[in-house]
Swiss-Prot record:
Upper classification of the organism: Bacteria, Bacillati, Cyanobacteriota, Cyanophyceae, Synechococcales
Keywords assigned by UniProt, alphabetized: Aminoacyl-tRNA synthetase, ATP-binding, Cytoplasm, Ligase, Nucleotide-binding, Protein biosynthesis
Record: residues binding ATP: 264-266, 351-354
NCBIfam families linked to this entry: serS
Name of the protein this chain belongs to: Serine--tRNA ligase
A GO term from the CC aspect: cytoplasm
Organism: Prochlorococcus marinus (strain MIT 9301)
Role: Catalyzes the attachment of serine to tRNA(Ser). Is also able to aminoacylate tRNA(Sec) with serine, to form the misacylated tRNA L-seryl-tRNA(Sec), which will be further converted into selenocysteinyl-tRNA(Sec).
Domain notes: Consists of two distinct domains, a catalytic core and a N-terminal extension that is involved in tRNA binding.
Amino acid sequence: MLDQKLIRENPTFVEENLSLRGKVYKISHIHELTVKKKEIDIEISSLQSESKKLSKLIGQVIGKSQNNNSKELNDLKKKGNEYRIKISELEEKQRILDKEVDDEVYNLPNFPSKDAPIGKDESDNLQIKTWGDPLIKENIKSHWEIGESLNLFDFVKSTKISKSRFVTLIGNGARLERALINFMLDMHTKNGYLELMPPALVNSESLTGSGQLPKFSNESFKCFNDDLWLSPTAEVPLTAFHRNELIDPKKLPIKYVAYSPCFRREAGSYGRDTKGLIRLHQFNKVELYWFCDPSKSLEAHKKITSDAESILKKLNLPYRLVDICTGDLGFSSSRTFDLEVWLPSSKCYREISSCSNCLDFQARRSSIRSKIDKKNTYIHTLNGSGLAIGRTMAAILENGQQTDGSVKIPDALVPYFGSNFLKTA
């Protein structure tokens, strides 16, 4: 959430920064609301101060007078009651204004970083580097063709169970998924992350804190009778884990890793990636998450990205690192580095991790602070996939395919999977 004080005092600055996302954001109405809200705050404080003075005066009059029913005392009590009624009325107006302001401000995205490349969409994203040698040759099979031939997963029967864009992993497919999850968790915990296993169901306050609500409600699955949603990413419960807390600065940075199933409606992706493991309604992911001192979040962003990269390097999967332009940034992100893995069947790189620095945007929405330099300060949050499991499996199947139809398992994964190759039964 953006700072309401900044919106109130410098609306032009806010509009100019948001416009870097390639859209026009008119905040004049929000500005008016925040100004009214501040005026009411001042009026309430003034009346409360006068009310305290009056209460003290009433006490003095009672102490001096033998008559507790004097005209002077009754007039003072009447005045005190008028103050209470007026304060109550203003507080009700304040509550209504608070909701109006929140409804508006919660729909404003984060400011893009001044270091992010300026652009309108993904075509303006900036490639920083590549790693590994992309596999380019004829007769490359797609991962879903390989999976079918090796009986690793079934999409058709999953449609019978649920609907399209779900998958059932079978035998070695399930085994490979489990091996990847354990491998990634072990790698990250050895690198200083504390493992959490959060709930898969989250409430609206949690989704609002991380930035999914209210703007993206149509992209998540909601339970019919409860204020609970299927979590679209572990970023949501990990943000909420410290909601409404004042964190000891000595504990910063806090680094979490969490495996979780993720659920997304993919409402805006009809017709895209209809085959395979790339875009499903349910998928598994290992998530990295940092809470850190604001002065150290730029370095933390490099580190969380490097930690995600280390998985791709260990698995010997060719990838590239991309700096996301201002027009393609996620709602809560100020700057994002994407890791895109090479998929030889489509002859292109595909996103497998987004590592984002959200600055104080999520912490402000979730009221997560720390006493830094003797002042309660909103801390910075960062998140990144480390990695998306299904897409990692797809990359292993395609990059490791052999001429005999088998798939070579990356050396680092062999102790977890139990063999060097995936073969037909």
